[in-house]
Structure formats: structure tokens, C-alpha cells
């Protein structure tokens, strides 16, 4: 039987709408659960040079239980002033933590923390470069200087910082490793990049929190990852990949029999300051995952399937409705189920971003609603840009931070 163009169109769009529906259901269910449990209520608002916190819900003051907590910021020196600002915030918490900065030999900036300088001639056995090289050297340095099972390392990028209660929780957390949820600091510097990052907030509140609480880090990210020092030293960071070190480390932690959990505290990140930086950042993430897929597949094939499904279908939440519009005007041929799926997908897509707005600045809610589709196109364009203009595999894109 020969299919007509309209029938083929109906089949394809119905498939796209149906494939996104499980994501929509999961996202909605998990975010509603967050509202009901208020499990991410430690959602401090970042303000300029300090963090304003609600009354603490984590009663953990035993800083002398034998456990040591250190914070490590890895930087290439491009954002030295930002790192200094983040270190001053961490110091203001007045906690018995040690602060370290892993930096390159060419970085002559003197940071207000203990410095670990990666020698210019240092080479990883698996030829890891850039951040992976620095992290791997750092793990060896910590081992050499006696940091072991009693020490927990909180890793930060050179634009991220965690709250005081996040660090307090580490002193008693019952896992070998873990991670919290993302929030924004310095939002609004670039409107579309800020609104685009609302997706990351909701992603963390739903899938990150859920999978981490189950001990399966299926959506891990680099900011705020906490690892016991001896575990990190055993696994290392020398993967020889372009990036995706956060995902790989999380999978290897579980693969090697260690535990991974959810830390009920915020990690503050800064949105990119321009469209150019936003696209360069997303391109780096996309290609890091694509190039690392064969490596990750050997560790956890389920993660690869999940990531591919999310990347391939995640964009269709907002286009499913538009894909079906021609059929509505030409001839109403969709089943009631597909119509219901399409409506639910669209509502969920708006709700997903509104949750991020709720956790950042409620006054932006109407603006987010009006700009929902332009922002979605802004984000979706990163995939097209990445495929058309792949990065230089021997060069690591660096963006300006604040």
C-alpha cells in the first residue's frame, strides 16, 4: 500500500509526539514531587557577594568528627578575578574547610587559597588534556600529600560556588560521593542565556535529584561534585577524552562499587554572558558527549541510551505542537490520544521552564511565558550550530565568566 504524503506526515509527527510523552510525564511527576516534598527547599538566593539563606534545615555542626572537607577550583587562569570572588564567598562561611586552586604553570595569578600548580611538562599516561589533565594531576597530588578516606573533595568550576549548608551536609553525608542541584547566580546579564538556563535548573530538580537519590547518577554535571579523596585517587581523571569527565567519573564511581547520593543543597552557576559564549559552551558539551560515547558505553550502556534518547527527543517538546498544526488545518486525522499527548507535552514544556523561573526570580515568569518559543529556538539552534561547526578537538573552548 502506498502511503500519501499527509499520512506519512501524520505517522512521523505522531511518533515524535509519542516519544516525547514519557519525558513529559516523568518531568511533571518529579517536579510536582519536589513541590510536595519541598526537598530542594534549600534554594538560597545568590546576592552579589554573599548568600542569603532561609533558616537552616540541616542540623550538622559536628565539624570535628574526623572528616575533612576541602573545596577545589580548577582553572586555566582565564577568569582569575571570578575565582578570587568565589574564594572570598567560601571563606565568609567560616567553616573549617581548606580551599585549593588547581592551576596551570603559566597562570601567574596569586589566588587566596592553597595552590596546586600543574607542571608545564606534565603528561597523563592516556594523553588527557586541559581540565582532565589538571584534575588528574590534582588527584595524584592529594594522594602524595596524605589526603585519604577521611577527606571529601568538593569540586567547583571557575564560575561556580556552593552554599554554606551544602558544605555542612558533606560532613555527615552517608555516601562516598554525591551532588546537589543547580541554581543561578548573576542572572539577567544576558537575557536569552539566562532564560535558556532555566532548563538546567528544572533538569537538576527533576532527573538529577531523582537519579542521584537512587544512587544512579544518570544526569551528572561537574559543578559541586563531591568525591571521597581515596575514591577519586583510585579512579583518576585520565580518560583521554575531549571532555565529559563529570559524567565518566560519576559512572566509574558506581561501577567500582562506591555509593553516589543526592546532596540537598544548591550549586550556583553563572549563565553565559553572550549568545556566542552560550553556543560555544553548548557545542563543547554536545561534542564532548559524542566523542566520549564509546568510552562511556563500556562503563554503563544504559547511560548512553538514556543520553541519546534525551538529546534526540528532548527538543521535540515544543515542536510537537507545531508539527501537528498543518494536519489540523488540512484535515483532522490525529487520534484523540495523540491530541492529548501533544497538549500535555506543550503544557509540560512551559511548566518545565516556569519551575526554573520560580526558583530564580518569579518576576520573570510572564517574560518567560512570552519568550518561551524564541528561547527554545535559541537553545535548539545550538545543536544545529554544533553539527555544522564542530570544535577543534585539540582546542578547548573557553568562555568569559562573571
For each predicted feature, which ranges?
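Membrane-embedded multi-pass helical conduit in multi-pass membrane proteins
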Residues: 2-41, 313-393
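Cell-envelope/extracellular polymer assembly enzymes that use nucleotide-activated donors
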Residues: 67-72, 98, 248
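Short, acidic, metal-binding catalytic loop of nucleotide-sugar glycosyltransferases
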Residues: 85-97
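Long helical/loop segments within the catalytic core of UDP-sugar-dependent glycosyltransferases
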Residues: 121-142, 170-235, 239-240, 279, ...
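Short aromatic/hydrophobic "clamp" motif used to bind/position activated sugar donors
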Residues: 153
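Acidic donor-binding/catalytic loop of UDP-sugar-dependent glycosyltransferases
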Residues: 156-172
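Acidic donor-binding loop at a coil-to-helix junction in glycosyltransferase catalytic cores
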Residues: 243-249
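Catalytic donor-sugar/metal-binding loop of nucleotide-sugar-dependent glycosyltransferases
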Residues: 251-268
Amino acid at each position: 500500500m502506498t502511503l500519501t504524503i499527509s499520512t506519512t506526515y501524520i505517522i512521523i509527527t505522531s511518533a515524535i509526539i509519542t516519544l516525547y510523552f514519557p519525558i513529559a510525564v516523568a518531568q511533571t511527576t518529579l517536579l510536582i514531587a519536589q513541590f510536595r516534598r519541598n526537598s530542594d527547599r534549600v534554594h538560597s538566593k545568590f546576592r552579589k557577594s554573599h548568600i542569603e539563606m532561609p533558616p537552616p534545615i540541616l542540623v550538622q555542626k559536628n565539624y570535628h568528627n574526623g572528616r575533612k572537607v576541602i573545596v577545589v577550583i580548577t582553572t586555566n587562569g582565564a577568569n582569575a578575578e571570578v575565582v578570587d570572588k568565589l574564594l572570598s564567598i567560601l571563606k565568609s562561611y567560616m567553616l573549617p574547610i581548606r580551599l585549593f586552586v588547581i592551576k596551570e604553570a603559566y597562570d601567574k595569578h596569586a589566588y587566596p587559597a592553597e595552590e596546586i600548580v600543574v607542571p608545564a611538562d606534565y603528561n597523563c599516561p592516556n594523553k588527557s588534556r586541559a581540565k582532565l589533565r589538571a584534575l588528574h594531576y590534582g588527584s595524584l597530588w592529594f594522594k602524595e600529600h596524605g589526603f585519604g578516606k577521611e577527606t571529601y573533595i568538593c569540586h567547583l568550576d571557575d564560575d561556580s560556588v556552593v552554599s554554606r549548608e551544602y558544605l555542612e551536609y558533606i560532613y555527615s553525608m552517608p555516601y562516598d560521593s554525591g551532588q546537589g542541584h543547580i541554581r543561578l547566580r548573576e542572572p539577567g546579564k544576558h537575557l536569552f542565556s539566562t532564560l535558556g538556563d532555566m532548563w538546567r535548573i528544572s533538569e537538576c530538580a527533576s532527573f538529577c535529584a531523582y537519579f542521584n537519590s537512587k544512587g544512579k547518577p544518570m544526569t551528572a554535571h561537574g559543578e559541586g561534585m563531591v568525591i571521597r579523596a581515596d575514591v577519586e585517587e583510585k579512579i583518576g581523571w585520565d580518560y583521554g577524552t575531549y571532555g565529559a569527565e563529570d559524567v565518566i567519573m560519576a559512572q566509574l564511581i558506581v561501577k567500582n562499587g562506591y555509593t553516589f547520593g543526592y546532596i540537598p543543597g544548591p550549586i550556583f552557576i553563572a549563565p553565559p554572558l553572550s549568545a556566542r559564549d552560550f553556543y560555544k559552551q553548548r557545542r563543547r558539551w554536545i561534542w564532548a558527549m559524542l566523542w566520549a560515547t564509546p568510552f562511556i558505553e563500556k562503563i554503563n550502556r544504559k547511560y548512553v541510551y538514556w543520553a541519546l534518547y534525551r538529546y534526540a527527543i528532548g527538543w521535540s517538546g515544543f515542536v510537537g505542537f507545531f508539527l501537528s498544526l498543518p494536519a489540523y488545518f488540512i484535515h483532522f486525522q490525529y487520534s484523540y490520544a495523540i491530541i492529548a499527548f501533544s497538549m500535555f507535552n506543550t503544557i509540560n514544556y512551559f511548566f518545565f521552564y516556569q519551575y526554573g523561573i520560580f526558583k530564580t526570580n518569579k518576576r520573570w515568569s510572564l517574560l518567560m511565558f512570552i519568550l518561551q518559543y524564541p528561547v527554545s529556538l535559541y537553545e535548539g539552534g545550538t545543536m544545529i550550530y554544533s553539527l555544522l561547526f564542530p570544535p577543534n578537538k585539540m582546542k578547548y573552548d573557553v568562555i568569559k565568566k562573571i
